[in-house]
Amino acid sequence: MKEIVYGPVKSWRFGKSLGINLLGEIPRICTFSCIYCELGKEGIYENERRIFVPTDKIIHEFKKHLRENFEVITFSGAGEPTLARNIKEVSDRIREIKKDIPQVLLTNSTLLNMDEVIEDILSFNIIDCKLDAVRKTTFERINKPMKGITLENVINGIKKLRRSFKGILSLQIMVLPINIGEVKEISEIVKEINPDEVHLNTPTRPPWKKPVEKEKLIPLKELFYPLKVRTPYD
């Protein structure tokens, strides 16, 4: 992914979305190397926050899309967006230009234990946090975290965000054949967090070629009752 601003693209979770890539042209900059990542295997591990793309450049590219029709502005892109130290500055600048469009942050939750990260993202309208496992072995197998990133930190970080975030908090669980048997355990942690919405997803884009079938995914929604749950098959 080389575009700084891309789309709009249709999202089953959020509608027509204009994407913001804060991380630039490197194939992937992330604290994870998930086995289902659509960006592929290339990329670098990183957990130090810095500015990858100057704010003015991002805003310049954003303004080129102002005549397009989109329902949300989604901060995602080529890796983990909270690694970008200018995430709040970019968000604030975009809000000055497009006050009426909700801003969505997609995060893998690994940096939410940092106070400065929490402070930087509180103004988003929607934050969608990843939680694919609650067992250490499954976490390491699916998400392939860089050294020093632990499952405990991820879960505690999401709980920390929940306590201070006033917007809509959703949790995304990527359901795969290797973690489908763990979804009940995941649901118990999710209920403790008490998000506004749960997204039971399954990968449908390359390099992953075997999404969980509708007949297996839909019944899992019951495990999260009474929380609101959505799937790509709804």
Residue ranges with predicted function:
Residues 15-17, 34, 70, 126, ...:
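Structural motif
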Residues 12-53:
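Canonical Radical SAM [4Fe-4S] cluster-binding loop centered on the CxxxCxxC motif
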Residues 83-212:
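Conserved AdoMet/S-adenosylmethionine-binding subsite of the radical SAM
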Residues 40-74, 89:
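Conserved alpha-helical substructure of the radical SAM core
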Residues 24, 40-43, 76-79, 143, ...:
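Short, histidine-centered active-site or binding-site loop motifs used for metal coordination
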Residues 48-55, 147-151, 210-217:
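Flexible, glycine- and charge-enriched loops at secondary-structure boundaries
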Residues 74-80, 108-109:
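Glycine-rich beta-strand-to-loop/alpha-helix junction loops that act as flexible
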Residues 1-13, 24, 59-60, 66, ...:
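Auxiliary Fe-S-binding modules of radical SAM enzymes
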